[in-house]
Amino acid sequence: MKKKKIAVITGIVAAVVILGGIATYVYVFKNNHSAPEIKDGVTDTQSSWNTDTHHIAAGNGGYYYTQYDADGKIRLYYTQVENENGVVLCALPECTHKTDACRAVLSGEAYQFGTVYYYKDFLYVIHKKEGMGYLCKIASDGSGREDVCALFAMDKFSSVSLVFHENDIYAYDSVGNAGGSENHVQEIKKISIGDYAVSTVYEYSGVGAAITGARDFGGYLYFIVMEYRLDMDSKTHYADERLYRYDYGNGIAEKVIDKQVSDYFVLGDTLVYFESGTGLYVYDFKTQKETLEVQADKNILVAGISYDGQYFYLDNAGMGSLTDAASRIERVIYVYDRSFNLIREIDCGKDCTGVYFGDEKYLFIKQLDAICYIKKEDILNGEWVQLK
């Protein structure tokens, strides 16, 4: 039943990403909070990136990314973006980079499609074999890779996401049993960097359940618990989403917001979240008061949001309806100043399959099989440029 339901609409996996944690954002608006420091990927847990759609990662002064090449193989590249061709990440002597023996190749059903993370001088991908997903660690110079631990049983619809905190990695399946009709248990697993011991730190049982949009903020792992329902006949869907957080210190998880939260960001005592179909709220943890700052409309029913110290970026995810699974609209990134005055609408193009937001330097999207960028310093007038 699960496979049949998910296969009906090719965008269902994308819908899970859209509905359950599209992107991240920071609140620096009408308050005294200062802008957070955006660090290089060497130490940053990269919470400003979209955890569940992670085909590019910052590190070592540049960016690692995956690309579907003309020969049908997915390869891992490194680039410093401007005026530089991407370098195939393989250190094998005399490698032609044309066979599966190349250490940059992540093709076929052996690896989760296009996913790559960077943390503390290593890259991490998900390696699938014999129905099990393994955490695979790759040297950042492309000199080698190894499977370090088993994570989850996986099928072709599974999509494992990773979040990093200090010396631990947290993993979950962001598709889970979304669209299924049976009760399943979804888990967040903790992996200790070093011995790579695995333990389960959170479980949720529900029909059509998935855990999505997890991010590291301070002493907590925040995440969205979704129960996704799909009507096969009418092609309508509905996602019940609630925001939770797991306390790293005491190991206790609690519900934070009991609304339809499509995305969120935490800055100190301030929580910013987007309620599907309603808009963007700013919530104060201390006073427990909130204000609606951006009203949802037909062009932005859900939103992923990022902030770079100067501007806010709201991605409408191309979602045309909260109930019609097939309804799509033009995918647009709306750029706002700190007072939420709209200053630009950036068309992502009809071939856009992902928005990554990036860091203080670049805004990234994926168009078909290519990653494109706009320099943040040119955000008011710049156009998309394809990575070489």
Q: Could you tell me what each predicted segment is?
A:
Residues 11, 20-21, 62, 133, ...:
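Small side chains
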Residues 47-59, 99-117, 154-166, 206-218, ...:
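Repeated scaffold domains used in trafficking and secretory/extracellular systems
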Residues 1-16:
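N-terminal Sec-pathway targeting helices
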Residues 16-27:
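Hydrophobic alpha-helical membrane-insertion segments, chiefly the h-region
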Residues 54-71, 114-128, 161-180, 218-232, ...:
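Short beta-strand elements that form the blades of beta-propeller/WD-repeat-like
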